[in-house]
Regions:
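Cytochrome P450 core scaffold surrounding the K-helix E-X-X-R motif
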Residues: 43-49
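Extreme N-terminal starter segment of soluble prokaryotic enzymes
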Residues: 1-2
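Well-ordered beta-strand positions in beta-sheet-rich domains
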Residues: 17-20, 99
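NAD(P)H dinucleotide-binding glycine-rich loop of Rossmann-like/cofactor-binding domains
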Residues: 90-122
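Residue-level signal for short segments within beta-strands and strand-turn junctions
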Residues: 5-8, 49, 72
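Conserved hydrophobic "DFG−1" position in protein kinase catalytic cores
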Residues: 5, 23, 47, 101-102
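Glycine-rich beta-strand-centered segment in the early N-terminal region that forms part
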Residues: 22-39, 52-94, 101
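Short N-terminal binding/cap micro-motifs at the start of the first secondary-structure element
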Residues: 10-16, 42-43
C-alpha cells in the first residue's frame, strides 16, 4: 500500500512517499477504509517536528494523520453498523495512507449533501 511515512523527527522534507507499506489488518470491531481524503492538522506538524515528543513520542517509521474520509473496504466480524461500500468519516491515527484500519466506534456515515439553492453561485 502507499503511505506518507516519517522515519525521524524534522521538517516536511522528512515525510516520504512509500509504495510498499504493509496493509493494516482488521479484526473484531475494526473497519478498513480506503481513503479518499485525509486532513492535515496542527498536531501533525507538531508531532512530525518533535515538538510533542515528551508527551506523545512517535515510534518510527510512523504514519501521521488524524482524520480520514473514504469508502469501507472490509469490516471485522463484530461490526454491525457498517458494510463494504459505505461512505464514511473517521477519527484515527495513521490516516496518511491508502488504507486505514479504525475501530467502529470512531467511524460515522458520510452524508450526501449539496448546497441549498439559495447559496449556490450563479
Amino acid at each position: 500500500m502507499k503511505a506518507v511515512v516519517l522515519h525521524e523527527y524534522g521538517g516536511p522534507e522528512k515525510l516520504k512517499f512509500e509504495d510498499n507499506v504493509p496493509e493494516p489488518q482488521i479484526s473484531g470491531t475494526t473497519v478498513l477504509i480506503a481513503a479518499t481524503a485525509a486532513s492535515v492538522n496542527p498536531i501533525d506538524w507538531k508531532l512530525r517536528s518533535g515538538m510533542r515528543q515528551k508527551d506523545s513520542p512517535l515510534s518510527f517509521p510512523a504514519i501521521l494523520g488524524r482524520d480520514v474520509s473514504g469508502i469501507v473496504r472490509a469490516v471485522g466480524a463484530n461490526v454491525k453498523h457498517f458494510k463494504a461500500g459505505d461512505r464514511v468519516l473517521a477519527f484515527s491515527n495513521a490516516t496518511y495512507a491508502e488504507l486505514v484500519a479504525v475501530d467502529d466506534s470512531s467511524v460515522t456515515c458520510r452524508m450526501a449533501w449539496t448546497w441549498p439553492t439559495r447559496l449556490r453561485s450563479r
